[in-house]
Swiss-Prot record:
This is Lactonase drp35. Belongs to the SMP-30/CGR1 family. Its EC number is 3.1.1.-. Ca(2+) 1 binds at residues 47, 137, 184, 235-236. The keyword tRNA-binding does not apply. Ca(2+) 2 binds at residues 109, 111, 129, 132, 134. The gene is drp35. It is found in: Cytoplasm.
Amino acid sequence: MMSQQDLPTLFYSGKSNSAVPIISESELQTITAEPWLEISKKGLQLEGLNFDRQGQLFLLDVFEGNIFKINPETKEIKRPFVSHKANPAAIKIHKDGRLFVCYLGDFKSTGGIFAATENGDNLQDIIEDLSTAYCIDDMVFDSKGGFYFTDFRGYSTNPLGGVYYVSPDFRTVTPIIQNISVANGIALSTDEKVLWVTETTAKRLHRIALEDDGVTIQPFGATIPYYFTGHEGPDSCCIDSDDNLYVAMYGQGRVLVFNKRGYPIGQILIPGRDEGHMLRSTHPQFIPGTNQLIICSNDIEMGGGSMLYTVNGFAKGHQSFQFQ
């Protein structure tokens, strides 16, 4: 009879040595991002990267509510204001220059969207938390000035979330898809015919083909082209001018890239991920007029700081509503 010492034994080697092993996407074109700017030596939940018409970068940290403004040329970091609403999660910029800030509230029913100047003045409730029950995580404008937003509620077996469209006058809210589990990132194709949505806790990528009215789904138009694997899941996303979709993978320290049909074509790794560092990658965004991508992440679990990283993507970023 074979002794225990002589039995076949599993060893940590290769992919099993990584804190976050990549299995199904291991054959994709893979690059590693370079550090671009340290936001804080403290672990802040960075999110919401968005550039204004002058090329200034805005972002926030969710749990403390700080709104940051960064000059990409000088790397100067300013904090123009702090959100008066709890747990802000995204910033999108209107072409009139106002910041639209999505906030999660109590993560149950007190989320909303407010607008403000870049200094935090002239506050306006766009979706107010007192009259609705949304938990709003992200939004994307269309060319008419309306926008789609994601409702972040629910969990894997209790899909309370969804995606909604708000008319350009901000008076009408129309459901697009519902009964999904923690709707998170959202992006609109260059021709505004395809809406991309990430479903975090069910680990799914939704591709929604829209009719010309922007709210009706085409026959058989709502599909799930990709299922993600691993702990946590897909977070915020953006597109480039070739309609490739860049999806940050929260808890995995990487960004996955999909073509316009939803096939994975590449991935970007955050340095230190195999050792368990900087896993909270949340949001990719292009510097306007370039193919240079900025990615935010933080190292809260390992006691590290908060960083922005950079790579070049497949194509230049899409010039969306705020640049029209």
